[in-house]
Design a protein with these regions (language model features):
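C-terminal extensions of enzymes
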Residues: 92-132
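Shared catalytic-loop signature of beta/alpha-barrel
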Residues: 1-108
Length: 132
């Protein structure tokens, strides 16, 4: 399909292994890869996919989790964009446990300079999700 349409095809948001991305690349099934570190198995696996994509001149545009992926796109040369979703009620709880959330300004997100992933967790919010 990717070869038949005149627009770049993007995929990868639900793929959970490097092998899946290897197959996408080998068959030229997409021109933009959308790995998700939360689905793929973490940061190391995401970086391996991004570097493999770069070796084939393919960009990555990670799926969802801007708070997680913003640092990753800043660390690779082939990042196209970072996907950003405004809070979707009753669908996604990750933003609800953050004390500070990344907010775009003029279409851009500034990479936090805090240690690690730069996340500031809301301990009280985390407690509300605890199962005892």
């Amino acid at each position: 399909m990717a070869a038949a349409v005149g627009i770049p095809v993007a995929t990868g948001e639900i793929h959970s292994s490097r092998g899946d991305f290897r197959d996408i690349i080998a068959t030229m099934a997409a021109r933009i890869l959308q790995p998700d570190a939360g689905v793929l198995g973490g940061i190391s696996e995401w970086m391996k996919v991004a570097h493999t994509a770069a070796s084939f001149d393919l960009p990555v545009a990670p799926h969802w989790h801007a708070d997680l992926h913003i640092h990753l796109v800043g660390a690779v040369s082939n990042a196209l964009t970072v996907e950003y979703f405004f809070l979707e009620e009753d669908i996604y709880n990750f933003e609800r446990i953050l004390r500070e959330r990344l907010v775009p300004s003029h279409g851009q997100i500034r990479i936090p300079d805090r240690p690690g992933l730069g996340l500031v967790l809301d301990e009280a919010a985390i407690e509300r999700f605890a199962v005892r």
